[in-house]
Design a protein with these regions (language model features):
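Non-catalytic, conserved peripheral segments adjacent to functional cores
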Residues: 1-108, 116-117, 121-124, 129-160
Length: 160
């Protein structure tokens, strides 16, 4: 019997994403010719052992949990040129749990922030809204040795 993640990949017609995991764009707002649409939405699934590689997007991103296990979302804020002014947020996305739990069903990533994610169980299915709409021209995978070293220091084992 196929895993629930495999069933969802098939049922939602998800394709491999260059950052890792599987996705399908499900909506793009209408826009005037030559204008960037205001919003886009995708389904995004990460199965056990998969991760979204460190990347950034030039637009705000809202992650909405749909089903599965919680997802760890790491968001790196570079800060200024002063050593130690940068910071790493460790967010957990998932169903509302106990009152003292840090798991939330919606998490935000600011435009330009570096991010990576991984499921904390068998799989996590999310919907990601991007405003203004996602464009691959505004997507950057991590390709900076100094930044990768800093991310490994802040978050060991995250593939930086």
């Amino acid at each position: 019997m196929p895993s629930r993640a495999a069933v969802l990949i098939d049922r939602l017609a998800l394709a491999p994403h260059m950052e890792g995991g599987h996705f399908r764009r499900i909506h793009t707002a209408k826009a005037a010719p030559g204008q960037r649409p205001a919003l886009s939405a995708i389904h995004f699934l990460l199965a056990a052992g998969e991760r979204s590689e460190w990347h950034r997007v030039d637009a705000e991103e809202a992650w909405h949990f749909v089903e599965g296990d919680p997802l760890e979302l790491l968001v790196y804020h570079p800060g200024s040129d002063y050593p130690g002014s940068d910071r790493l947020e460790r967010l957990r996305l998932g169903p509302l749990g106990e009152p003292d739990s840090d798991v939330q069903p919606i998490r935000m990533v600011p435009a330009g922030a570096w991010q990576t994610s991984r499921p904390l169980g068998a799989y996590a299915l999310c919907t990601c809204l991007v405003a203004p709409a996602f464009e691959f021209a505004g997507f950057t995978l991590l390709d900076d040795d100094a930044l990768a070293a800093r991310l490994r220091e802040l978050a060991p084992g995250t593939g930086a």
